[in-house]
Amino acid sequence: FSFFFQYSVKANDLPSGDNVVSGSVIISTQDTSMIINQSTDKAIIEWQSFDIGQNNSVTFNQPSINAGALNRVISGDPTTLAGSLSANGNVFVINENGVYFTTTATISANSFAASTLALSNDDYLQNKLQFYSDQLSESLASVINKGFITTLDGGFTALLGGAVNNEGTINANLGKVGIGVGQEIILDLSGDKFLQVAIPIDEAITILDENEEEVDLLIKHSGTMQA
């Protein structure tokens, strides 16, 4: 089995095709910036696209650092983050077709997670961060970080998928960093086992990078992580 991650983003790209599934959210766009005002502790937004161009910014204004916004891309296209994403709370980006952070991407939040595994609405609303994929053996999707991800003191960063490559910088001062690959991944924010992974043992998997060259490891790390 193999995957080939293709990515492209235009300079003027901002997330589009929003549908607020849960919570109270007001979204406004002006020129190169998008403001997402969230007034409930939890919000779920489905998007046709969640791309951010290099000179563009997306800002989540949330009621507290414990508030969270789950952003799910449903179009079938991968997500490319090349600009700025900031939040005073927690942001989750779910795209089962891939998430790519370019070298110009900057992420700043209390906590941040990007995943190509699914997370159900019910689990999220019940504080169960249980990510899963029923198609891992058929189609692997990757998370590739070449940018800068920073979370507030005590926050967490999680990159989860069929394959994860971190070439960028992740700062989680006094917090946690989790890079996980598997068919099922659970984030336990209250216990000692922050990241729990179930990996299929009966799969022969070949990973291809963006140049269609074989990669030996499902997790590659050549960047910087501080927690």
Identify what each model region corresponds to:
Residues 1-227:
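Extracellular and secretory-pathway beta-repeat/beta-biased strand scaffolds
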